[in-house]
Amino acid sequence: PYGEDALRAIARHREMRRGKGFETIERPRDIGGLMLPESGLPRCALLECLTTLCANEMFTTGGITDPSEKIIQGIKKLAAQTEKLVIVTNEVADDGIEYPAETMDYIRIMSRLNSRVAALADTVTECVCGIPLTLKGELK
C-alpha cells in the first residue's frame, strides 16, 4: 500500500471490521507465502482486494509482468488453509474506454484473472449498487 489514499482506505476498512472478530493481515504481494494463524475456530479468510493485489504484483518489479499464475497458485494455497475463502475483486473492463498500453495490459490480465478465479469458486456474486446478484452457485 502506497500513498495517503491507500493508508486512509486501509484505516477505513479496519474501522469497519473493528469488533467483528477479524484479524487483519496486510500482504500487498505474494499471498502464496502467507501462513494463516492457527485457531480452534472454523477458518474463514477474506482476500481484499484481487485488483489491488494484481496491480501490486504487476507494477512493482521494475517492469510489467503477468502475475496471474502466481496469484492463482497463491489463492489455492490460501484456500487450502481455510474452510471458506471470500475474494473481493472489481470489474475493470466494462467502461469501453481505451487507456494507455500499460493500463490495457492490466485490464486484460484482470479480466482473465477474474475468469480463472470464478472458475475455481463454488459461488460467484456480483454486487451492483449494493444488491447481490449470484452468478454461480448459491449465496449462503
Q: Which residues does each predicted region cover?
A:
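Short coil-to-beta-strand
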Residues: 42-51, 83-87
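Short, surface-exposed linear patches
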Residues: 15-20, 46-48, 67-69, 108-111
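Structured helix-beta-strand junction loops
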Residues: 19-20, 41, 81, 120
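Conserved P-loop
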Residues: 1-39
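Short, basic/glycine-rich phosphate-binding loops at helix/coil junctions
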Residues: 11-15, 45-59, 93
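Short amphipathic alpha-helices and their capping/turn segments at secondary-structure boundaries
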Residues: 28-42, 70-83
